[in-house]
Every structure is written in structure tokens, then in C-alpha cells.
């Protein structure tokens, strides 16, 4: 087997995010949630859940400002109605983010006509024709664009989508891949007394993200500097945890199962996996300059930080995105990377590699399985 380094690398050329127009501070969300929750659920419980969520604001397509929007007290929409909401909102979110990502990629000479492959991802809805067909029409992409949809993989789907994009450009250096994600979690607000569903109601929000991945040759440097180089992705499936987190399609929307032991399992299990994965790139935990930890909730961030012995500064970006946007499922990790790219110095570890070496970033996200996905990048220096 050849050990020669590849002549090209997968460059993250641009990244953009989007959210619905309706911003909901915690107090407003709590007022609406109280009217949509069965009366036997104590308002004090909802208040505690909201306060412990770490979320101060969120954007939700299902709610009009100051109104219930899609929902009505004592009326529970069926899955078909929720999918109609998802389709409208997901199209808008993905198109908004994709247009911004393409505009940014223009500095590298990339236009809509340059896109050869389109990877879409969402776990909050389905439609056919889907987001991919809509984006081809809306953005003016070639009708011969190769399409791939990463469906129903949960909060780590951004990593899976980027893994597909990376594999594509390494196999075909002429490829230019648009990755578009949209999550409309507010389409699955539940009128319920189940604690895990109440927690899900409290945590999740909506958003969109788009990224462009292209090959970059170290010899020619034909493109302008990328935001980062995607070095690799890594996966794990934690044994005997399939009942701890699940995402099912029900008659009244998608239903989340969240086990209370998830943070403890992650704290116990992930360090060995992370260390093994980083070691394949000659890295240790202390070499990582920037961390993007999917904020499944404050306890998940706490668990990962404890397992990896990360200082508060290393998870500040993850907490900030949770605070300002909520858990947007697969879209959340790109939001965190965007924050790191905009102000990397604020989140860098002081004991990370020297200025002469690469600037490693790591993204971690978790989903039903329990499954973990990791992306390792070398960030561009600013």
C-alpha cells in the first residue's frame, strides 16, 4: 500500500448560516410553550427546564412573533401538516445559506455554475422532490449536478455530509461540492406530559447552513485561501446504548427519546475514541486549538469538557451558540465553526501547537445510536 500523501486536499472554501425571521427570547418562548402544554404540566417545571437549557434566544419557523403560529392550544397537527411546514421553512433556510455561501466563494472564482455535486442534509423532515431539487432551480445550478441526501442521521449529519464532500473532491479534484443543511425542529413541538419530550421542546430550534468544498493542490494553490482544510472524519457507535437516544416518525410528528444518562455515557466513553482518532493524525487532545462541541444541552457540553479535560474557554463557542440559537440539530456545528472562523483567537487553547505548525480544529457531535462523529480540520490562519 502506498504511503504517499495525496496531491490534493479538501478545502472548506466558504461557510454561511441562516435562521428564520422570528426571534424568540426565552420569556416569549416560555409563554407560548405554557399555552401549548397540557394543563397538568406545572408551569414551574417548564420554567426550570427553560432556565437549565442555557438558551436565551432561538429562531423558530413554526411561531409567528407574539403568536402561536403553526400551533393552536389543544390542537395537535399530524405528521403530514408538519412536513408541509418543514418543506416551506427548510427550502427558505437552505437557499438563504447557500446564496450567502456562494457569494463568499466568489473570492475563489466559484459561482453557481461551478457546482458539480450537491449534498443536502436534514433530520426534521422529508419531501420528494426535496431541498436538492429546489436549490438547483433557485440557485441556477446545472441540471446535471450529482445529488446526495443525508437523511435522518440526527445532530451529527453535518459531519456525515462533509465526509461525503471530502471523499468526492479527493476522488475528483475538479469537483466543487455545495453542502446544504436545514433543520426545522419547531415542526415537532409536542403537546405532551412526557419529560423527555418536554426537554426536547425546550432545547431545539431552527436554522440552516451551507458550505462549499473544493480540491486544493498544495503545489499550485490555484484557489484563494480556504477557511480550513478538512483533514478527516471519524465515527463511533457506543455499544449497548441504542435505547438512550432515538428519533422516531410518529402519527403526530417526529418523536424524540432522550435518556437522562446520555451525558454520563459520553463522559465515560468518548475520551478513548477521541484520543485514538487524533493519534492517527499525530495529534493529542492538547494539540487542538479550536473545539466545536455540538451542544445537545448544557450537560452534554459539560460531559465532553470533563471527559477531555477542556478549559471553559475551549467550549465557550459551543455554549454561546446554544445560548443565542438553541440546539439546531445538524446545523449547529457549522454555526460553531463560523464563530471560530470569525473570532478564532477568543476560543484557542493556549497549549495548542505553535504558530509554525497547523491550527487543528475538531468538531464533535452525537446522535441516536449512541453515535459519535468527529471532523478534524486545519484552520486557515488569520
Where are these regions (language model features)?
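Conserved beta-ketoacyl condensing-enzyme motif
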Residues: 53-141, 152, 285-301
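Condensing-enzyme catalytic core mediating Claisen C-C bond formation in acyl metabolism
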Residues: 2-87, 176, 191-268, 272-276, ...
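Short, well-ordered amphipathic alpha-helical segments that serve as non-catalytic structural scaffolds
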Residues: 55, 89-106, 164, 208, ...
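Claisen-condensing/thiolase-fold acyl-transfer catalytic domains that form or cleave C-C bonds
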Residues: 6, 123-125, 130, 142-144, ...
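A contiguous, well-structured pocket-lining segment that forms one wall/lid of small-molecule binding clefts
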Residues: 85, 96, 101, 246-322
Amino acid at each position: 500500500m502506498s504511503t504517499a500523501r495525496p496531491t490534493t486536499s479538501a478545502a472548506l472554501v466558504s461557510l454561511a448560516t441562516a435562521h428564520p425571521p422570528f426571534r424568540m427570547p426565552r420569556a416569549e418562548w416560555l409563554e407560548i410553550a405554557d399555552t401549548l402544554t397540557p394543563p397538568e404540566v406545572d408551569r414551574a417545571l417548564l420554567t426550570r427546564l427553560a432556565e437549565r437549557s442555557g438558551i436565551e434566544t432561538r429562531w423558530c419557523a413554526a411561531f409567528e412573533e407574539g403568536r402561536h403560529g403553526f400551533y393552536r392550544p389543544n390542537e395537535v397537527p399530524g405528521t403530514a401538516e408538519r412536513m408541509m411546514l418543514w418543506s416551506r421553512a427548510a427550502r427558505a433556510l437552505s437557499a438563504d445559506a447557500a446564496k450567502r455561501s456562494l457569494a463568499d466563494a466568489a473570492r475563489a472564482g466559484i459561482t453557481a455554475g461551478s457546482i458539480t455535486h450537491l449534498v443536502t442534509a436534514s433530520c426534521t423532515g422529508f419531501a420528494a422532490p426535496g431541498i436538492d431539487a429546489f436549490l438547483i432551480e433557485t440557485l441556477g445550478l446545472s441540471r446535471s449536478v450529482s445529488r446526495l441526501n443525508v437523511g435522518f442521521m440526527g445532530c451529527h449529519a453535518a459531519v456525515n455530509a462533509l465526509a461525503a464532500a471530502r471523499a468526492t473532491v479527493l476522488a475528483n479534484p475538479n469537483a466543487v461540492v455545495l453542502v446544504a443543511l436545514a433543520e426545522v425542529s419547531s415542526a415537532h413541538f409536542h403537546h405532551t406530559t412526557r419529560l423527555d419530550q418536554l426537554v426536547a421542546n425546550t432545547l431545539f430550534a431552527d436554522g440552516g447552513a451551507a458550505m462549499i468544498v473544493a480540491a486544493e493542490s498544495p503545489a499550485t494553490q490555484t484557489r484563494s485561501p480556504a477557511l480550513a482544510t478538512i483533514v478527516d472524519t471519524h465515527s463511533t457507535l457506543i455499544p449497548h446504548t441504542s435505547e438512550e437516544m432515538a428519533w422516531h416518525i410518529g402519527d403526530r410528528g417526529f418523536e424524540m427519546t432522550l435518556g437522562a444518562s446520555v451525558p454520563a455515557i459520553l463522559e465515560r466513553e468518548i475520551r478513548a475514541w477521541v484520543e485514538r482518532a487524533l493519534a492517527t493524525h499525530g495529534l493529542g487532545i492538547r494539540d487542538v486549538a479550536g473545539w466545536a462541541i455540538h451542544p445537545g444541552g448544557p450537560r452534554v457540553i459539560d460531559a465532553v469538557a470533563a471527559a477531555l479535560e477542556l478549559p471553559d474557554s475551549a467550549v465557550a463557542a459551543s455554549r454561546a451558540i446554544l445560548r443565542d440559537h438553541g440546539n439546531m440539530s445538524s446545523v449547529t456545528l457549522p454555526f460553531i465553526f463560523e464563530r471560530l472562523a470569525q473570532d478564532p483567537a477568543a476560543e484557542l487553547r493556549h497549549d495548542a501547537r505553535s504558530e509554525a505548525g497547523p491550527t487543528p480544529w475538531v468538531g464533535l457531535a452525537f446522535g441516536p445510536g449512541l453515535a459519535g462523529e468527529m471532523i478534524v480540520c486545519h484552520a486557515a490562519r488569520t
